[in-house]
A protein has these predicted regions:
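Polar, enzyme-active/binding microenvironments
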Residues: 2-260
């Protein structure tokens, strides 16, 4: 059956959408084989336009919005950068409103962005969690305890472990649903965002370990401690304001849920 009537019904006037959003939407719809709802298109556009207004868009170097698309293939279309490699996820793991869920054993994404691709003292990694793991697991990472590793890990129900091109591991608060993120602006401090709060920690940088960052686990020259959490967004890149990113991603996920 022709998709033309569906596409006409879901047409958004081009001038309402950010140019980068139009490109992203076209690629997602091509992967899905179908048009997106008006509300999803506008949510994507508002997110991109808002990130540009906040001055954080250019710092995002590798990212996927793991929500909104009609199919898993569409969800893995990169917002920015190279597409991730899907290792073992299937369509049943994907929910348009809440994102992609791991199984804690075999399923992960290779971001295809090397941990050393961003400057040692200007970088961030971020995830939007819809559901948390219940056991110690890596959410995103390259390395483990080696100097220059970068990671976000659930340690237990009361704390998290984080590194960002670091010489040592920092213990943070328990991971909660929403944005879980780290940024680094200099050689001595990292900022950790969780539960709507940003806390700065003393943490000395090191030459970034040369491994691709994995999502739903850490790349320790192979998959290490994968997670069963569910994520609706990830971002990797240069330093940015985590509070601004948090606000934009939260609005994005809420708008997608309301549009479907």
């Amino acid at each position: 059956m022709s998709l033309l009537p569906h596409r006409l019904f879901l047409l958004v006037p081009p001038w309402l959408l950010d140019p980068d959003a139009r490109d992203f939407i076209n690629r997602v719809e091509a992967a899905d084989g179908d048009a997106l709802e008006n509300g999803v298109k506008i949510a994507y556009s508002n997110f991109i336009r808002g990130c540009k207004a906040d001055g954080i868009w250019n710092a995002i170097k590798a990212s996927c919005i793991l929500a909104g698309a009609r199919t898993l293939s569409g969800a893995l279309v990169p917002l920015v950068g190279t597409a991730p490699t899907n290792l073992n996820f299937v369509s049943g793991d994907y929910n348009r409103r809440t994102g992609l869920v791991g199984n804690g054993s075999t399923k992960y994404l290779d971001s295809n962005r090397n941990n050393n691709a961003d400057p040692q003292n200007s970088r961030h990694i971020a995830l939007y969690s819809s559901t948390q793991a219940t056991t110690p697991q890596y959410y995103i990472g390259a390395g483990q305890t080696q100097a220059g590793s970068s990671l976000i890990s659930r340690s237990d129900g009361t704390q998290s472990l984080v590194r960002l091109a670091s010489n040592s591991t920092t213990t943070g608060s328990a991971l909660t649903n929403g944005l879980n993120a780290i940024s680094r602006i200099n050689s001595s401090t990292i900022s950790v965002r969780n539960n709507g709060n940003t806390i700065n920690y003393a943490n000395t940088s090191a030459t970034p370990l040369s491994l691709n960052l994995f999502i739903f686990g850490s790349n320790d020259s192979g998959l290490n401690s994968p997670t069963s959490a569910r994520f609706a967004f990830y971002s990797i890149g240069e330093f940015l304001d985590l509070a601004l990113l948090d606000a934009r991603v939260t609005d994005l996920i809420n708008a997608i849920a309301g549009a479907i």
